[in-house]
UniProtKB/Swiss-Prot annotation:
Catalyzes oxygen-dependent 5-hydroxyuridine (ho5U) modification at position 34 in tRNAs. The lineage of its organism: Bacteria, Bacillati, Cyanobacteriota, Cyanophyceae, Acaryochloridales. Belongs to the TrhO family. CDD domains: RHOD_YceA. This is tRNA uridine(34) hydroxylase.
């Protein structure tokens, strides 16, 4: 039975006092044995945390006690193991980094499309569908026919969008991402640039996988998530991927059969790209992880990801 509850949430809202929120929020999470990452900025909050259900609800109650977060809509999923090893509350310039000034999702965004209605939009020949996630995410799963921008980070997307003549040829643009936050900014950017018929998947891929039956789904593959689960599939069940600890790339069961796969040290995606010093460091880290497992302990040095949640 799944024991740990993971919740992902975000909200764009003006937080001039965001720095003052860090200490009490971190203390609340630590007091309730909750792990994960929460980002705070003047533009809002973005987080993913996990713990025992009653502890998670205590933290959410604490958050929603602030009127600015009263309508927070966390997305839930379950796991048998802790998906995070640490609790971090970080202060940022943006809760999801795009790097474009004057883009304010509280003022204008694309039209939300419910997961139940998303298939109909995808079938519209007048719609350009864009996966706004990064290349390593798209590589393990996406919607059929979606355009892959081949970006390494979300901050590369604005430049890519400016170069796309295809967007001028069709009257409608639809975007999707993991949980919705990147679409808030990317659709706001398109609206800012004068596009009128802009849509995005409400609640992101995670809501689609949760609400749309697998036999009706147009999703292909797994959805990368920013924690130790690495990926989830339909019904938000654990996917088939693990994470290469050397390069942070999702690796499939087929990748793990490669002669270039050494647990914690290399995979087919990064074999031969690391220095001898890095290889020695990775080998020692893996040794510590294995020792911790033998002692039935968690090696907190095994970070889940270098990326932001969202």
């Amino acid at each position: 039975m799944s024991e740990f509850l993971t919740v992902a949430f975000y909200k764009f809202v003006e937080l001039q006092d965001y720095a003052e929120l860090k200490a009490p929020l971190l203390a609340c999470c630590q007091d309730n044995d909750v792990q994960g990452t929460i980002l705070l900025a003047t533009e809002g909050i973005n987080g993913a945390i996990a713990g025992l259900p009653h502890n998670i609800h205590t933290v959410l109650d604490f958050l929603c006690g602030d009127p600015r977060f009263a309508d927070l809509a966390p997305k839930e999923s379950w796991s048998e193991k802790r998906p995070f090893y640490r609790m971090k509350v970080r202060l940022k310039k943006e809760i999801i980094k795009m790097g474009v000034p004057d883009i304010d999702p509280t003022q204008t965004v694309g039209e939300y499309v419910k997961p139940e209605d998303w298939n109909q939009l995808l079938a519209d020949p007048d719609v350009v569908v864009i996966d706004v996630r990064n290349d390593y995410e798209v590589a393990i799963g996406t919607f059929k026919g979606a355009i892959n921008p081949n970006t390494k980070s979300f901050s590369e997307l604005p430049e890519w969008l400016q170069e796309q003549a295809e967007l001028q040829k069709k009257p409608k643009v639809a975007m999707f991402c993991t949980g919705g936050i990147r679409c808030e900014k990317s659709t706001a950017l398109l609206r800012h640039e004068g596009f009128e018929d802009v849509f995005h998947l409400q609640g992101g891929i995670l809501s689609y996988l949760e609400k749309v039956p697998e036999d009706e789904s147009l999703w292909q593959g797994d959805c990368f998530v920013f924690d130790e689960r690495v990926a989830v599939g339909h019904g938000l069940k654990p996917g088939r991927y693990q994470l290469c600890r050397a390069c942070r790339t999702p690796i499939s069961p087929e990748d793990m059969k490669s002669e270039h796969y050494v647990p914690g040290q290399s995979c087919p995606h990064c074999y031969g790209t690391k220095t001898e010093e890095q290889q020695q460091r990775f080998a020692e880290r893996q040794r510590q992880i294995e020792l911790a497992k033998q002692r039935n302990q968690v090696h907190i040095g095994a970070k889940y990801s270098r990326h932001q949640p969202g």
